[in-house]
Amino acid sequence: MSNNPTPCPGAQFTLIQDAINTASPGDEIDVCNGIYAEQLLINKSLDINADFGAFLVPASIPQNATSLATGDGIAAAVFVSGATNVSISGLTVDGINNGITGCAPRLIGVYFQNSSGILRHAAVRNFRLGTALNACQSGTGVFVESGGGQSSDVEIADCSIHDFQKNGITANESGTNAKIHNNVVTGIGPTTGAAQNGIQIGFSAEGAIRENIVTNNVWSPCMVVVTCQTVATNILVALSDNVRVSDNTVGISQVGIFIDGNDAELRGNTAFSASVFENIRIQGNGSRVQENKVFNGGEADIYLEGNNNSVVRNSISEAPIGILEAQGFTGNHITANAFFNVGVTIQDPGVNNLSKRVVPDR
């Protein structure tokens, strides 16, 4: 299919949505280069492959969905609803012309709701509101959500996600399993608006976050520990357990990797330049922090709050304190870590819980 004046062999449609509506489950749709000024609704199994130069740039993005968790209105450029085996590859999804004039409906680039599939080699960009609305908790690149006893199993791979207002990638709610890997997720840098999170798995969702590059999520009013009211993160696990975070590179944020849950595994990550708090923060029980490299933490490089966690064989560099192990917890195993240019290797302060200062996307 094509809307480009240059001939595209075999093209039968000028709108992607017309091709979707006509297709049978399991069909493949090839999208030729061109600019497609439309929203998409995908409610059947399809394989959508876009050529280089295929841009989905809706002329406006009105509400077309409702959040299963909050009941909020959602305005999504691409809405995958109740479908399985959906593949979207190679498409650039651009929200620059969204036209939204308030905090509602919430703006999302690609929204999987009770659906399964893969988003690969996509670019998702410019999901932001106007400057006067920069504090709205809106503007997420990719959002995966389950509800009503249904499930979503989604892979997000090899994508470029940037110029979002709230989160780059979010996967939420029980029934959701997200495999998020080999993406580049870049925040907008210091902002007084919505506190950003690069990648989030939350609210009983499960999954793995691996081999991503996530940087530049900074809430600029948060400058020192004692006065900071809100924090931005590069990777956030919010009230979810058993999430694996491995081999990512994260940098430039208040907290690099924030685990607010239990039984997480953090292995082989490189985290740097946590400007106020830590490169790795664990709030929960039974997590394993192993073989990570952390550099230049603000307060410390690693913060540990909970029981029966292990911090083993990490390389910890350039911070006032290497590991902050909060008082009042038992069973933690801290051994075989290497410390470089660290004032104090391990210190046991009082609890400084940040759960109420992080702002998850939901």
Model regions and ranges:
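Parallel beta-helix/beta-solenoid
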Residues: 24, 43-45, 51, 82-83, ...
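Glycine-centered, small-residue-biased loops immediately flanking beta-strands
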Residues: 27
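Extracellular beta-strand-rich solenoid/capping regions of secreted or surface-exposed proteins
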Residues: 17, 21-24, 36-49, 56-90, ...
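Short glycine/acidic-rich loop motifs that flank beta-strands on beta-rich extracellular proteins
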Residues: 36-39, 52-53, 57-61, 75, ...
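Hydrophobic "rung" positions of tandem beta-strand repeat architectures
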Residues: 110, 119, 142, 169, ...
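Right-handed parallel beta-helix/beta-solenoid
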Residues: 1-22, 33, 47, 361-362
